[in-house]
Curated annotation (Swiss-Prot):
This is ORC1-type DNA replication protein 8. Belongs to the CDC6/cdc18 family. It comes from the Archaea. It comes from Halobacterium salinarum (strain ATCC 700922 / JCM 11081 / NRC-1) (Halobacterium halobium). InterPro entries: AAA+_ATPase, AAA_16, Cdc6_C, Cdc6_lid, ORC1/CDC6, Orc1/Cdc6_arc, P-loop_NTPase, WH-like_DNA-bd_sf. One of its GO terms (biological process) is DNA replication. Involved in regulation of DNA replication. CDD domains: Cdc6_C (cd08768). Gene3D superfamilies: 1.10.8.60, P-loop containing nucleotide triphosphate hydrolases, Winged helix-like DNA-binding domain superfamily/Winged helix DNA-binding domain. Disruption phenotype: Not essential for normal growth. Keywords: ATP-binding, DNA replication, Nucleotide-binding. ATP binds at V61, G62, K63, T64, A65, Y211, R223. GO terms for molecular function: ATP binding; ATP hydrolysis activity. SUPFAM superfamilies: P-loop containing nucleoside triphosphate hydrolases (SSF52540), Winged helix' DNA-binding domain (SSF46785).
Amino acid sequence: MKTPFRDRVELFANKDVLKDHYEPEEIRERDEEIDQYANALQDVVDGWEPDNVFVYGKTGVGKTAVTRYMMDALEYEADDRDGVDSVTSVEVNCHHHPSSYQAAIALVNELRGDTDSDPLTTGLSTSDVLNALFDEIEAREGTVLIVLDEIDNLDDDDMLLYQLPRAKTNGNIEDSQVAVVGISNDYTFRNDLSPKVQDTLCEREIKFPPYDANELVTILDDRAERALSSGVLTGGVIPQCAALAARDRGSARQAIDLLRESVNVAIEDERETVTEDDVETAVRRVERGRIKDSIKDLTTHGQYVLLAVTQTAIADDTPVRAKELYEVYADIAAEYASDPLSQRSVHDHLNDLSMLGFLRQHDRNYGRGGGQFFEYELDVDATMVQEAIADADDATV
């Protein structure tokens, strides 16, 4: 049978090294952040109660990778030292479990993963789920670090962030100790927590800045050595991938995606060398993929608000104020038989879309006569947004 598949081109030695799931054994260009993390967690290996830690930074700057590296290092160090209690770390992504109740169930089931206990299911009361979580923590008779990735996705219910740090004080655990490690893309996340939760957390903060071009070159050199066959890259490919990613968001993920797609372009053209022209072709592919993936993660009304800005941009009417955009948004919602949200909610969506990189936000101040307000314009390609929303599962536009 004749098939449409090509013979394998030996440009990749190990393509998985350039995939999202790959976790490097050694973390590059994050020594300062690792030192801050070690200082924040030093009490654990010294035998004291751990501090809560919150980690902030944009997507792709190493927050989750460094956190996992530090959890592994901490568990190893605790095992290696005499007189130090065992350390257990458990991670849950709050994007997939966006309420305290769902996150608590997921934590229980992660902790039960290596036991004979049955997993929890929904339907239990909140107090029963919390008691099950405290029981699992107490059963470890050591230090348990609860890692909540994308913690800014937790809804307005602060229950878990209030209960975990107070577990020992409230008598929910006795022979163990627990701390929360929160990872967030949103630097203002803490401000949205209730005052009692802010007072309870008393956390240490670690901020991850975007990578610069030189740091991204180091990271790409390391990945390329493991992922690619010798001599397949022309000299300017890695610097170009690094420069483009640094200029955009400073994301290692973006730089690695550009490198991988550049190699794919060369393979599809049946060439044995990757050039800077291949990088230019890869840029649009990566951007389209990023936009498509990010739009899938938006709520339905988040997509409607983004589409409203996109349509306004196509009409050459941006930057636009939120109150002027609202009518466009309401028409889109009505088109899909959905009741529009309040103007305040739309304003919140606009702020979120700005933080995610879809929009550019302008602060206008015209004094007493004109007032102060924000205007918004699209910061990504309008056609890509339309195509991505058209493909999204929960909004076909």
